């Protein structure tokens, strides 16, 4: 039995990652799910949040927003609308986006504006959380 699985993360613009890993945790729209080698095949929609993977005793973090995860034959394929490695996240930009989203939320005139501002706030917070988790884990280079 295989003990590793291949993780591939792809966006419309680029291949973000292709690497053998021990474990993958991802934000599904119904909640987080985890995948290890020899997992049963499945397909899941992705939410906004932090995908993480374990490689030996190190944990790496990648911000993802939207898309799908496909699991099968010891391979996890993430087709994400947005995927950013922790090292690529600009903290100042994410903080600015957070403040802007909070201001938009406070001024929202209807449910649509409110939902858009809430989604922007969720993305900004997830980016900041991703960067923070990677720094705490000492894996900001991935």
UniProtKB/Swiss-Prot annotation:
This one is known as ATP synthase epsilon chain
Q: Name the Gene3D superfamilies on file.
A: ATP synthase delta/epsilon subunit, C-terminal domain, F0F1 ATP synthase delta/epsilon subunit, N-terminal
SUPFAM superfamilies referenced in this protein's UniProt entry, alphabetically: Epsilon subunit of F1F0-ATP synthase C-terminal domain, Epsilon subunit of F1F0-ATP synthase N-terminal domain
Record's keyword terms, sorted: ATP synthesis, Cell inner membrane, Cell membrane, CF(1), Hydrogen ion transport, Ion transport, Membrane, Transport
Q: How does it sit in the membrane?
A: Peripheral membrane protein
Q: Which family does it belong to?
A: Belongs to the ATPase epsilon chain family.
InterPro entries in UniProt = ATP_F1_dsu/esu_C_sf, ATP_synth_F1_dsu/esu, ATP_synth_F1_dsu/esu_N, ATP_synth_F1_esu_C, ATPsynth_dsu/esu_N
Q: What does this protein do?
A: Produces ATP from ADP in the presence of a proton gradient across the membrane.
What PANTHER family does this protein's entry cite?
Answer: ATP SYNTHASE DELTA/EPSILON CHAIN (PTHR13822), ATP SYNTHASE EPSILON CHAIN, CHLOROPLASTIC (PTHR13822:SF10)
The record's Gene Ontology cellular component field reads:
plasma membrane; proton-transporting ATP synthase complex
Classification via CDD domains: F1-ATPase_delta
Q: Which residues form a coiled coil?
A: none
Query: Which Pfam families has this protein been placed in?
Result: ATP-synt_DE (PF00401), ATP-synt_DE_N (PF02823)
Q: What is its main location?
A: membrane
Organism equals Maridesulfovibrio salexigens (strain ATCC 14822 / DSM 2638 / NCIMB 8403 / VKM B-1763)
Question: What GO MF annotations does this protein's record show?
Answer: ATP binding; proton-transporting ATP synthase activity, rotational mechanism
The entry's localization annotation reads: Cell inner membrane
Q: Does the keyword Transit peptide apply?
A: no
Q: Which HAMAP family match?
A: ATP_synth_epsil_bac
Query: What does the annotation say about its assembly with partners?
Result: F-type ATPases have 2 components, CF(1) - the catalytic core - and CF(0) - the membrane proton channel. CF(1) has five subunits: alpha(3), beta(3), gamma(1), delta(1), epsilon(1). CF(0) has three main subunits: a, b and c.
């Amino acid at each position: 039995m295989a003990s590793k699985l291949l993780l591939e993360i792809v966006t419309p613009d680029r291949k973000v990652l292709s690497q053998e890993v021990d474990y993958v945790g991802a934000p599904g729209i119904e909640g987080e799910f985890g995948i290890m080698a020899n997992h049963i095949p499945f397909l899941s929609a992705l939410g906004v949040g932090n995908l993480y993977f374990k490689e030996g005793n190190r944990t790496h973090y990648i911000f993802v927003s939207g898309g799908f995860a496909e699991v099968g034959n010891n391979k996890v394929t993430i087709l994400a609308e947005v995927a950013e490695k922790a090292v690529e996240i600009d903290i100042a930009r994410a903080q600015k986006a957070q403040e802007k989203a909070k201001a938009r939320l406070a001024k929202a005139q209807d449910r649509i504006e409110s939902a858009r501002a809430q989604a922007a706030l969720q993305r900004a917070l997830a980016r900041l959380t991703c960067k923070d988790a990677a720094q705490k884990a000492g894996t900001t280079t991935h």
